């Protein structure tokens, strides 16, 4: 029962969503069953800062954590500012996932 939105993706280049909590649903309007198997790109749109996404991608490819914020979009198409922190977590010997903790913000940092 987290206040923050939690999204877990596989650590492959595709980064498919394997888990989302109820706070993700409240934040974005997307149901958990709607997003599992998709990528977080479903939240991106025309005003999403591509430079932030490039920094995110570079950090993840290097196995590093990332913190950032950007304009994302709810299921209904309304834009909002999302702040997020993504960390790599090893769950088995050779298996890693990315855990993203997200919350709505008032300004892009």
Predicted segments, located by residue:
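Conserved hydrophobic beta-strand signature of PAS-family and PAS-like sensory domains
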Residues: 15-18
């Amino acid at each position: 029962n987290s206040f923050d939105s939690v999204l877990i993706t596989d650590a492959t280049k595709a980064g498919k969503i394997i888990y989302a909590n109820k706070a993700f649903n409240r934040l974005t309007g997307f149901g958990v069953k709607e997003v599992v198997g998709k990528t977080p790109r479903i939240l991106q749109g025309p005003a999403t800062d591509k430079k932030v996404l490039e920094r995110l991608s570079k950090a993840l490819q290097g196995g590093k954590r990332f913190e950032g914020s950007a304009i994302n979009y709810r299921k209904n198409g309304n834009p909002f500012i999302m702040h997020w922190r993504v960390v790599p977590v090893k769950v088995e010997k050779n298996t890693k996932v990315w855990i993203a903790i997200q919350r709505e913000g008032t300004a892009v940092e």
